[in-house]
Amino acid sequence: MAPRIDHYDWSGGREALLRFGPDTGPVVILVLPLFEEANRTRTFAVGLLRRLAERGIAGLLPDVPGQGESVVPLEDCTRFCMAEVLEALTDRCLDEGRRTYAVGMRSGALLDYCALHSGRWHLAPQDGESLLRDLHRTWRAAGNDGDRQAMMYGADIVEIAGNLLSPNLLTSFSAAAPFDQPGTPRRVVRLSSDPAPADRHVDASPLWRRAEPGDDPALAELLADDIAAWIAACEA
């Protein structure tokens, strides 16, 4: 099932999205990991949403400011503005009478904290500390010297793996954590190699760690079944 190209508006402009599946019923809003991990997982995410569509569940894959095809410069972004656009997209779905479920991958799970979702499903979610640790490791590997504070505050803009990041954006991740509040269903799935607590661990290799973009159709099938069953339980 081929996705349809669409867009959505927010207070700062307009962003692109891919739309999958039916135009009625609950809808999944999938948020990719940030920065380089987005490139490595996008093909997998598209395959996952296609499989959900085959199971009768609609899906949206939005660009957020500074990512994908967005015209907003990444160096002008904060975590809040990324969350704001996802809230705007969620509100549009709610205005259409459709319940929404967030699917966040890795650091994408840090961006859906404003939206009024009926539930959240997270794959290998990162907290802000883990994200900053990964960014600092990449920054050091590029030949830079210094601790995390030097990376975050040593210049007006820091370049990490081709991404131009501001101190404001980096600081906004310092105490960030995936949304987990009473009253909102949340399911966490992690890889078997990840010892962190989860509702389920699955055997697979981490696509986000590969040097080049990749795919894992078997994992996409497994996770589509998991998400579909979880949404059905939430809707019951």
Q: Which functions belong to the PLM regions below?
A:
Residues 44, 73-97:
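Alpha/beta-hydrolase active-site loop
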Residues 33-34, 101-108, 123-127:
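Structural motif
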Residues 116-236:
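The alpha/beta-hydrolase serine catalytic core
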Residues 40, 65-77:
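Cap/lid segment of the alpha/beta-hydrolase catalytic domain
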Residues 57-59, 100, 118-120:
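Hydrophobic anchor at the start of a short beta-strand
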Residues 94-116:
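Glycine-rich nucleophile elbow surrounding the catalytic serine of serine-hydrolase chemistry
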Residues 11-15, 19-63:
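Short, surface-exposed "cap/lid" segments of acyl-processing enzymes
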Residues 1-6:
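A domain-start/cap signature at the N-terminus of enzymes
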